[in-house]
Design a protein with these regions (language model features):
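Extended soluble regions of mature proteins
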Residues: 21-219
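Bacterial Sec-dependent N-terminal signal peptides
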Residues: 1-26
Length: 219
């Protein structure tokens, strides 16, 4: 159960959507960096990361997007899981491989308010794609998102009710999926970077939820 909740919480940093424009998949590499190097010896931090994710020390998330829907295959090294957004009820469903128990979060609500979104001068190049960035500030921390409006465009109207993770406001601001995200909160420093992508037709069946024996609302 702890693993399920962990995967769902990681969705805050990696949460992505799609649009009528982009249909396909993006694979992200997610790293948990030392949030307090002056307080936590890096050797101890890396040991904890290896215990969580194995020798690879990072998580892979392959996300499929189509017409306002998204679903992800999550490889956390020692654990594998799934994350699916259901636009019909507005919930995110997270579950482990071979499990019939899901943990959900209501994306129509967001307790992390207020926020401020502003343009940033930070630039980066991800997989040969030049990116500019925005900064999202909230009560609990700060997030930087790198993007290029020529790639992975979305229709913000599809996410106007998707308040969780401030996704509705982020999509309204940039109108596309981010290629890189860095989020810093109390004792947390997560970096997620695109390492692969492909525009392709996605079968609707991939977004279908399995039958669960138990559904736990995390909020």
């Amino acid at each position: 159960m702890t693993k399920q909740i962990l995967i769902l919480l990681w969705a805050v940093y990696s949460i992505t959507a799609n649009s009528q424009t982009f249909e396909g998949f993006i694979t992200y590499k997610t790293e948990a960096l030392n949030p307090e190097p002056t307080m936590i010896p890096d050797s101890i931090w890396q040991q904890g990361v290896k215990e969580q994710f194995g020798d690879r020390t990072y998580m892979l998330q392959k996300s499929y997007y189509k017409e306002g829907r998204y679903t992800s295959e999550i490889d956390a090294g020692k654990e594998k899981g799934f994350l699916t957004y259901n636009p019909e009820d507005g919930f995110l469903y997270s579950w482990q491989e071979n499990s019939d128990v899901a943990v959900t979060i209501n994306t129509k609500t967001n307790t992390d308010e207020p926020i401020k979104i502003m343009d940033s001068k930070q630039l980066d190049t991800i997989m040969g794609i030049p990116c500019k960035s925005i900064i999202v500030k909230s009560d609990t921390g700060e997030m930087v998102l790198w993007y290029n409006t020529d790639y992975f465009r979305v229709n913000p109207k599809l996410y106007k009710k998707h308040k969780y993770g401030h996704w509705n406001r982020i999509m309204e601001k940039i109108g596309c999926l981010p290629l890189k995200t860095e989020q810093k909160k109390f004792m947390s420093h997560i970096v997620q970077t695109m390492i692969d992508y492909k525009e392709m037709e996605i079968n609707d069946k991939i977004f279908q939820l399995p039958e669960f024996k138990e559904i736990i609302n995390a909020k």
